[in-house]
């Protein structure tokens, strides 16, 4: 609910956990006060220690990013866990990521899957996408392409660019679905609309090979270049290949070598 700063401060100093959280947010965003991350941490902590899930998650983020406090992954995990156990989907997702990457906790794919699933079942598009990826790669679960597609599709249909890219990949490769290049291109297009470099490279590949679209080397080069300029190594290699072969561009070995080098 909207508070004005003075009202919020009075309530926060009286120990109102919700007001403490909102005051922390105000300091974070510089709303009605000078932006001050240390004060954000101070008020998030007071609220979090009273059990406010939003503040626990916020404090976890501050520790994970090292903003207003010294970066500390173990502290981030501690606060994410408190919020996750209260059912906060964002915290469940972030806790899953920490387990998947072994940040602040020993790496544990099964724990990652557990938290991704909790978050995904609450509708988190990011968690649905990651859970799909875990099924696709057989990480923390038995590999199951159909289950991968189920979760990836939920994410994609919510408009999440990784879900869209990964669903396109499933259609391109016939993993968990009947292979369908046109359907792959449809999902890649949605993901490139959000600037996803993997999808840009994948769409370039579709044009390069005439899969789901009419073969068009110039279009291939366009999408490879967009991905390559974002640092995508595979796209850099593909762009080098186009220059080496004069496909969609004037043949230029120097340019080819330049992009091959970047990709190495």
Residue ranges and their predicted role:
Residues 13-16, 29-31, 36, 49-52, ...:
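Short helix-capping/linker turns of helical repeat alpha-solenoids
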Residues 21-22, 44, 57, 80, ...:
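Aromatic (phenylalanine/tyrosine) cluster motif
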Residues 10-11, 46-47, 82-83, 118-119, ...:
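Canonical positions in the second alpha-helix
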Residues 1-30:
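N-terminal segments that cap or nucleate solenoid repeat domains
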Residues 187, 223, 257-264:
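TPR/TPR-like (Sel1-like) alpha-helical repeat modules
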Residues 22-29, 58-65, 94-101, 130-137, ...:
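Hydrophobic face of amphipathic alpha-helices that form TPR/SEL1-like repeat modules
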């Amino acid at each position: 609910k909207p508070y004005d700063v003075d009202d919020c401060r009075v309530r926060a100093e009286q120990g109102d956990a919700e007001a403490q959280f909102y005051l922390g947010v105000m300091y974070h965003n510089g709303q009605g006060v000078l932006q001050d991350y240390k004060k954000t941490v101070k008020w998030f902590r007071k609220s979090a220690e009273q059990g406010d899930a939003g503040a626990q998650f916020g404090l976890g983020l501050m520790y994970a990013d090292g903003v207003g406090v010294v970066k500390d992954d173990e502290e981030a995990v501690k606060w994410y866990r408190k919020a996750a156990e209260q059912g906060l989907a964002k915290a469940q997702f972030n806790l899953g990521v920490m387990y998947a990457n072994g940040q602040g906790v020993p790496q544990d794919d099964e724990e990652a899957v557990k938290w991704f699933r909790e978050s995904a079942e609450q509708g988190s598009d990011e968690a649905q996408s990651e859970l799909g990826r875990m099924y696709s790669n057989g990480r923390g679960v038995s590999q199951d392409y159909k289950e991968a597609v189920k979760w990836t599709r939920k994410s994609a249909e919510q408009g999440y660019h990784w879900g869209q890219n990964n669903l396109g990949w499933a259609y391109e490769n016939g993993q968990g679905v009947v292979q369908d290049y046109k359907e792959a291109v449809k999902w890649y297009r949605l993901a490139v609309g959000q600037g996803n470099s993997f999808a840009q490279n994948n769409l370039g590949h579709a044009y390069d090979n005439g899969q789901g679209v009419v073969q068009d080397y110039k279009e291939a080069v366009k999408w490879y270049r967009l991905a390559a300029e974002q640092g995508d190594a595979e796209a850099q290699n593909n762009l080098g290949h186009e220059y080496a072969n004069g496909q969609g561009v004037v043949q230029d070995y120097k340019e080819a070598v330049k992009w091959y080098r970047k990709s190495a």
